[in-house]
Amino acid sequence: MPKYRSSTTTQGRNMAGARALWRATGMNSGDFNKIIVAVVNSFTQFVPGHVHLRNVGKLVSEEIYINGGVAKEFNTIAIDDGIAMGHSGMLYSLPSRDLIADSVEYVINAHCVDAMVCISNCDKITPGMLMAALRLNIPTVFVSGGPMESGSVTLSRYNNSSDVKLSLVDAITASANPNITDIDKEQIELEACPTCGSCSGMFTANSMNCLMEVLGLAQPGNGSLLATHFDRKEMFLNAGRYIMNLSRLYYEKDNSIVLPRNIANKMAFENAAMLDIAMGGSTNTVLHLLAAAQEGEISFTMKDIDRLSRKVPHLCKIAPNSDRYYMEDFHRAGGVMGILGELQRCGLLYENTYNILNKSLLDTLRQYDIKLCQDLEIKRMYAAAPAGVRTIKPFSQNNRWNSLDIDRFAGCIRSQEYAYSQDGGLAVLYGNLAPKGCLVKTAGVISELKSFRGPAKVYESQEESVQAILTGQVCSGDVVVIRYEGPKGGPGMQEMLYPTSFLRSMGLDLHCALITDGRFSGGTSGLSVGHISPEAASAGLIGLVCDGDMININISKRSIVLEVSDYVLKNRYEIEISRGTKAWTPSCRNRDVSFSLKAYAKLVTSADTGAVRDRSQL
């Protein structure tokens, strides 16, 4: 049988000092033979998705004690990508993912913890904790804070005829839209983010929390049940019960199937990618899945994403890919288990993956897929509805829909027969501009833009591109190229939500493309191609593009090509190399880069490997 990891600090004569310190935290002699569970919280008042988490750690801890364990809570950092967006603060977002993973590892290993419950929610916190879980490989349960309710407003330009549903992205685009009055802009700003929780569309945070369900490390409903709803309280209580059950299976019955690397294995990662493709999730999720797979020593690459994207249908469009459906609507339609049920009926899923419920995926679908479900309590959980009341309190309302959305013809989730497309909501493109691949969220691309050819407008920072867009320097038909914004070149791989949102504000989103070695917010739509690998700072071809060069993007052919001769490119390469130590750096960018970000840039790899540390340098 595996020994409790905690016995290193709780057993033996020479650990008297450690036990004395444990006692000073509230433990007693009877606790030294119990499983010690870390409750890894991420409460902060800086982030709406985490502002309500102050007391939920106590709920989990109390349930762990009731079930015979000892709970010890600590906190990680959390950055709000929306508040950090559009200025130098975004340089810190992606690096914070690795800091979170490291901080969890440090606390868990320093104190020899036996198991952990991860209370996450927003963009980099869930993947950072996932990386830590796979790195540490101790019994782990994830439970997220839940999505925000969508906003709602009646605007004068609609003649007061109907309410318009809103998300954060509407506030950003309205700020630069000359056709929206100041009064309407203010109303949108006031109502776009009405409650606590992760932003209300299928953005990065909600995409990741959905993927945790199919990876097997979180309960059904984790990604879609609203933060404000009373039912979410039971999820936190369940997390305490589940972690004690998993811990006993491992430490007392030597059942290693409950460990994260055995639950979230290669098949589970492929299932997660298929879910992401089917629901048109954020492209950031690919970055995080690739990084997490490396932590778990799982062979999962961009080639796998490419292969799966060609056979998985696109079954769901949620904001920002739709102005009709938001996370509360997705939950009403059965959430993650609803989509997985449709994929299972297509014969696409690996059905025998395992999860924290101590069930196979197939058995879980039989219980939780609302098309099959006979359990009235589960149906009641999926009927959890928004209240439309501004609040930052969790579990503060108990509204229910009168009926579930089981319409698979024109509802929030479609069947394969009525899919938006048969080849998925995400695609990997290859070509001379991206020999190691790049990503596009096809769920947000209209059919007319899926083949696009245009002249390049090149910018060496996000800020420069925003200024050009807002001052009319970008025209219909252009391909906006934003480079030196990759993991190394930024450094930090900023999200390009402001450039894409302002293209939309200026009426150019249906007439232009944008490509970058940076990344995109989950709120991005339009023909936005990111994660171009290798990045400019790693001598990628995107660093040699000049204004006016023709770029050809073809999603159906999965290609992205710079139409410049090899002879011309060779000359440009030699000119770039002649810059010496300044080669493959921006020629005219004014950006202060801190010591910590410079250290990050020294070790980080390009996006095709998840922007993880280059272990060959260690």
UniProtKB/Swiss-Prot annotation:
The entry's keywords: 2Fe-2S, Amino-acid biosynthesis, Branched-chain amino acid biosynthesis, Iron, Iron-sulfur, Lyase, Magnesium, Metal-binding
InterPro entries in the record: Dihydro-acid_dehy_C, DihydroxyA_deHydtase, DiOHA_6PGluconate_deHydtase_CS, ILV_EDD_C, ILV_EDD_N, IlvD/EDD_N
SUPFAM superfamilies xref list: IlvD/EDD N-terminal domain-like (SSF143975), LeuD/IlvD-like (SSF52016)
Catalytic activity, reaction form: (2R)-2,3-dihydroxy-3-methylbutanoate = 3-methyl-2-oxobutanoate + H2O; (2R,3R)-2,3-dihydroxy-3-methylpentanoate = (S)-3-methyl-2-oxopentanoate + H2O
Modification sites for N6-carboxylysine: 124
UniProt EC number: 4.2.1.9
GO molecular function terms attached to this record: 2 iron, 2 sulfur cluster binding; dihydroxy-acid dehydratase activity; magnesium ion binding
GO CC, alphabetical: cytosol
Chain coiled-coil ranges: none
Major enzyme class: lyase
Binding site for Mg(2+): 81, 123-124, 495
Entry note: cofactor: Binds 1 [2Fe-2S] cluster per subunit. This cluster acts as a Lewis acid cofactor.
Keyword Ribonucleoprotein applies: no
BP-aspect Gene Ontology terms: isoleucine biosynthetic process; L-valine biosynthetic process
Positions that bind [2Fe-2S] cluster: 122, 199
Active site positions: 521
Pathway given in the UniProt record: Amino-acid biosynthesis; L-isoleucine biosynthesis; L-isoleucine from 2-oxobutanoate: step 3/4; Amino-acid biosynthesis; L-valine biosynthesis; L-valine from pyruvate: step 3/4
Cofactor names: [2Fe-2S] cluster; Mg(2+)
Record-stated family: Belongs to the IlvD/Edd family.
Oligomer status and interactors: Homodimer.
Chain's role: Functions in the biosynthesis of branched-chain amino acids. Catalyzes the dehydration of (2R,3R)-2,3-dihydroxy-3-methylpentanoate (2,3-dihydroxy-3-methylvalerate) into 2-oxo-3-methylpentanoate (2-oxo-3-methylvalerate) and of (2R)-2,3-dihydroxy-3-methylbutanoate (2,3-dihydroxyisovalerate) into 2-oxo-3-methylbutanoate (2-oxoisovalerate), the penultimate precursor to L-isoleucine and L-valine, respectively.
Protein name: Dihydroxy-acid dehydratase
Lineage: Bacteria, Pseudomonadati, Pseudomonadota, Gammaproteobacteria, Enterobacterales
